[in-house]
């Protein structure tokens, strides 16, 4: 059984360690610059807390660098002199490629393993990560690592290093930017004079029902609203009512919805809707919008 260690005892390293252990991989332990963090992660994985990174490296076959993106190169340079033939060094960054591993010693393999999952705690339930997909970047196309990782039972896909940053941007659209959209919506609710205690939760059934429909049935089936219905006056009124800094955001996202609507309803002529949204892209009449709001 492969012996696994983690340099970095934060939420990602801790959750992965717990998950690997639940799948009968041998987790040897953790090293972190804060011994308390190493000890806490070791407790959660029934493993060891190491006081030196070199000692952890010596005890493991697979070493995961579960540190922030900006710290990867520094940690790599620290452990590189201690590596030996047959070891595999992983990072878990969605944005960084294997290029961060410079001057790889002969006989050492490198790999990245990125879970498509929002991890908020190392102690969170394993239910979500059991369903999560992972992307893998391999230094060696014929590597046996992919076969070994398939033992986790998760969906796996190989990604080229040159595509990592665009891939990570896509992940941000699926996760982080959604939070920004929700914040934007609640701000608009409050601007309408709705009470804060109402706006804090009123959007949740709408959001969750829509998200569930999207996941279960796909974008075309889930799409509703004025763009799909080709409600020209409603979309125009939206653009006039929104603050200037939100008009562009509404327009960009609506053009994506328009593409889906056109695929869903090829019998509908959306040319006027396209014109309205195209006009917004080329500079919506914000002076008119200001007059309307007054």
Predicted regions and their residues:
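NAD(P)+-binding Rossmann beta1-loop-alpha1 motif at the extreme N-terminus of oxidoreductases
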Residues: 1-55
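Internal alpha-helical scaffold of NAD(P)-dependent oxidoreductase catalytic cores
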Residues: 26, 40-44, 103, 109, ...
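Short, hydrophobic beta-strand segments that form beta-sheet elements in well-ordered domains
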Residues: 28-32, 89-92, 134-137
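Short, polar loop motifs at secondary-structure junctions
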Residues: 33-37, 94-97, 139-142
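Rossmann-like NAD(P)(H) cofactor-binding subdomain of soluble oxidoreductases
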Residues: 45-124
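Interdomain hinge/lid region at the active-site interface
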Residues: 212-269
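NAD(P)-dependent dehydrogenase/reductase Rossmann-like domain
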Residues: 260-261, 265-294
């Amino acid at each position: 059984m492969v012996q696994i260690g983690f340099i970095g005892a934060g939420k990602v390293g801790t959750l992965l360690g717990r998950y690997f252990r639940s799948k009968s991989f041998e987790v040897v332990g953790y090293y972190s610059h804060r011994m308390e963090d190493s000890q806490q992660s070791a407790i959660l994985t029934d493993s060891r807390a190491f006081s030196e990174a070199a000692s952890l490296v010596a005890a493991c076959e697979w070493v995961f660098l579960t540190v922030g993106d900006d710290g990867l190169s520094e940690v790599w340079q620290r452990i590189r002199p201690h590596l030996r033939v047959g070891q595999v060094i992983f990072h878990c960054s969605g944005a960084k490629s294997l290029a961060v591993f410079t001057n790889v010693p002969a006989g050492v393999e490198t790999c990245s393993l990125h879970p498509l999952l929002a991890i908020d705690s190392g102690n969170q339930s394993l239910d979500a990560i059991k369903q999560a997909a992972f992307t893998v970047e391999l230094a060696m196309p014929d590597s046996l690592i992919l076969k070994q990782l398939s033992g986790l039972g998760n969906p796996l896909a190989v990604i080229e290093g040159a595509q990592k940053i665009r891939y990570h941007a896509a992940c941000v659209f699926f996760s982080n930017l959604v939070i920004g959209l929700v914040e934007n919506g609640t701000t608009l609710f409050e601007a309408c004079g709705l009470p804060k205690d109402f706006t804090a939760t009123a959007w949740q059934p709408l959001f969750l029902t829509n998200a569930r429909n999207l996941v279960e049935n796909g974008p075309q089936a889930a799409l509703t609203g004025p763009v799909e219905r080709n409600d020209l006056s409603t979309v125009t009124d939206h653009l006039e009512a929104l603050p200037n800094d939100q008009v562009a955001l509404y327009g960009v996202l609506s053009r994506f919805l328009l593409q889906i609507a056109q695929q869903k309803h090829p019998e509908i002529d959306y040319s006027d809707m396209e014109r309205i949204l195209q006009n917004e892209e080329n500079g919506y009449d914000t002076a008119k919008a200001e007059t309307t709001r007054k």
